[in-house]
Amino acid sequence: MNKEVFATKTAIILGDRDGIPGQAIEACIKTTGAHVAFSTTECFVUTSAGAMDLENQKRIKALADEFGAENIIVILGGAEAEASGLACETVTTGDPTFAGPLAGVQLGLSCYHVVEDAIKEAVDPAVYEEQIGMMEMVLDVDAIKAEMQQYREEPVEA
């Protein structure tokens, strides 16, 4: 993904207290020219059954309605592959726990983890290294990439 793609996107950032915080992701994403509409840092593993925070689901749905799903990109900072995958599933095919506003709602949003190559290559390398480089060394980046790819490859039913 290149910077030109980001210039037309509205970013929703879901950082993780135990992974990469929203503020660090936001600093990176701002170097791409994307408009950051919402940025937060949550505890992915603290929420019940790994479900996305209900208020965040509500906010994401409202932003998708406001800007159009095709104009949104969700960037995650989860420490664990499985938790990141659940968040990705929630914003693409709907809340798998059926607990929140996105239960049964297939937004089909583009969703990436900040350590994925598509994001890393679009971000200013110096800012990425400063904000994320240290955490990248302790995360299981390969597992995160594989999990995220799996959810992007699942078809979203209309």
Curated annotation (Swiss-Prot):
Protein family per UniProt: Belongs to the GrdA family.
Protein name: Glycine/sarcosine/betaine reductase complex component A1
Catalysis performed (reactions): acetyl phosphate + [thioredoxin]-disulfide + NH4(+) + H2O = [thioredoxin]-dithiol + glycine + phosphate + H(+); acetyl phosphate + methylamine + [thioredoxin]-disulfide + H2O = sarcosine + [thioredoxin]-dithiol + phosphate + H(+); acetyl phosphate + trimethylamine + [thioredoxin]-disulfide + H2O = glycine betaine + [thioredoxin]-dithiol + phosphate + H(+)
GO CC annotations on file: glycine reductase complex
Role noted for this protein: In the first step of glycine, betaine and sarcosine reductases, the substrate is bound to component PB via a Schiff base intermediate. Then the PB-activated substrate is nucleophilically attacked by the selenol anion of component PA to transform it to a carboxymethylated selenoether and the respective amine. By action of component PC, acetyl phosphate is formed, leaving component PA in its oxidized state. Finally component PA becomes reduced by the thioredoxin system to start a new catalytic cycle of reductive deamination.
E.C. number: 1.21.4.2, 1.21.4.3, 1.21.4.4
Species this chain originates from: Photobacterium profundum (strain SS9)
Active site: U46
Top-level lineage group: Bacteria
Keywords per UniProt: Oxidoreductase, Selenocysteine
Enzyme superclass (EC): oxidoreductase
Pfam families with a match to the protein in the record: GRDA
Subunit structure: Monomer. Component of the glycine, sarcosine and betaine reductase complexes, together with components B and C.
Recorded GO MF terms: betaine reductase activity; glycine reductase activity; sarcosine reductase activity
